[in-house]
Amino acid sequence: MLSRVFQQFFPEESPDFFKNLLKSIMTIDDFQVLVMSKFVRWVLEHTAKNFSYDGISNIDPSKKFLALSNHRDIILDPAIFQLVLYNNGIPMTEIAVGDNLITNQTIEYLIRSNRMIKVVRGITARELYLSSQLLSRYIRLNITEQRSSIWLAQR
């Protein structure tokens, strides 16, 4: 399955290229730069006539932040945002993703390899309250201690 996916985004490369590429990935940043940025560029080239953004100069690369977005496209929007950050020399964010989008173990590995935080859904009200508190503490700690920025979609 993965070889077919890679072939789509790296059509000029041999299957050995994919094996070597995967072996060369040592960090999440490596994965995001070597694989995900290529994927996002491919999506933009094949689905958009034009892509522009503004306001990036309002982000201080030396500080961590919380990026809030609407719930329009929970996968593609943050992926594009990561590419914009990367292209502007700003560290990429962690991304909160609902567990309803994690359909199998392979998807979970891919999501976690892309600096994503699993948000548990479909639980009791009490469990949701406790889970939300834990997520809030995690976000606050990461930002206030300058560990990482967070991207979060809201409804």
Residue positions per predicted region:
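A conditional alpha-helix N-cap/helix-loop micro-motif detector
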Residues: 46-49, 128-133
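Well-ordered alpha-helical segments embedded in enzymatic catalytic cores
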Residues: 80, 131-138
